Amino acid sequence: MRTTALIAALVAVGVLAGCTQPPPPPSPSPSPTVTATPVPVVDLTAPGEARAMVRRLIAKAATPRLIQVEITKEWAAITVLKDDRTETWAWRDGTVKQVDSDVTYVRQTVFEVDDFDISDVGALFTTAASISGSHSSQELQIVDSSAGGVFMSVSTVPESRTVFFYPDGTLLPTLDFATEDGIRTGLKDVIGTRSTAVALGLQSNLGAWLDFPGSASTTIRRLRTATVPVTINERAQKPELTPFSVSRVQPESIWRVLSDAREKGRFTASTRWEVAIDNRARTGVPRMYFTIGTQSVVTDLSGQPIG
């Protein structure tokens, strides 16, 4: 009986134990909140910001020898020259790092950032927009214009008129070649530091130009258009004309011929005209060959008609 009662008691205890609910598991501890590090917001059009950023990039590049600078409101990049090898460094999304670039060194003029007034890029953008008519995705670039002169320029996307600035931040003037001042400035720009040319001239719808020998079989042209600084182009043409001193060409003499044509009713602000100055007559003294509308005139360097 005792054994039977004990067995019954053990069975009962086992059944009760099997029916008992296990204690609930402990509540999990809350996970710590992860906070992203904010990316520094820098507006490079604010006064002083662009210059500070370019200097920061130069410090990373470890050389001040620049061949290109690019600046927008949100990012900046520089291309430097190291032993005829280019490196590009950029600041984007709060990070400064070396980046891939298709910029190569083809004897561009090397410059330093302190030669350029980028203390207020926003002001340059405002001036450029007043001329181009667009604020869209403005970008400032500092680079050799191809004629050895380094200018600042502001372009937009979609593309509008590119606006150029001198290194000190003053605006490159737009030239009107139907005025004496436009003629004077255009000639001054294309002559630059040259003392001789094989040909020199102006075209009302193109600009001022100067030709000089490149190699024995090429001629180089310097061109200043109404809105773009001097550029150069080398063409396969053997220079056959005799060089002459460009100091002999006076802008007022060119204007005198145009003024005379105006008085005779052959020249207005919309009249297309051109003049080429060279020694094609083989006299040893260059002459000025004008085409004004449909009229042709040949003069000496003082503007007096010949023949």
Q: Where do the language-model regions lie?
A:
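N-terminal export and membrane-targeting signals
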Residues: 1-11
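C-terminal motif of bacterial Sec signal peptides marking the signal peptidase cleavage site
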Residues: 14-18
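Bacterial signal peptide processing site
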Residues: 19-23
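Extracytoplasmic low-complexity, Pro/Thr/Ser/Ala/Gly-rich segments
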Residues: 26-102, 175-209
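Exposed beta-strand-loop-beta-strand "reactive/processing" segments of non-cytosolic proteins
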Residues: 59-84, 142-161, 191-216, 273-298
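Long, acidic/polar, low-complexity amphipathic helices and coiled-coil-like
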Residues: 68-72, 77-81, 86-177
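Long, charged/polar, surface-exposed segments that mediate recognition or autoinhibition
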Residues: 100-136, 230-270
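Extracellularly exposed regions in secreted/surface proteins, prominently low-complexity, repeat-rich
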Residues: 155-195, 232-239, 260, 264-307
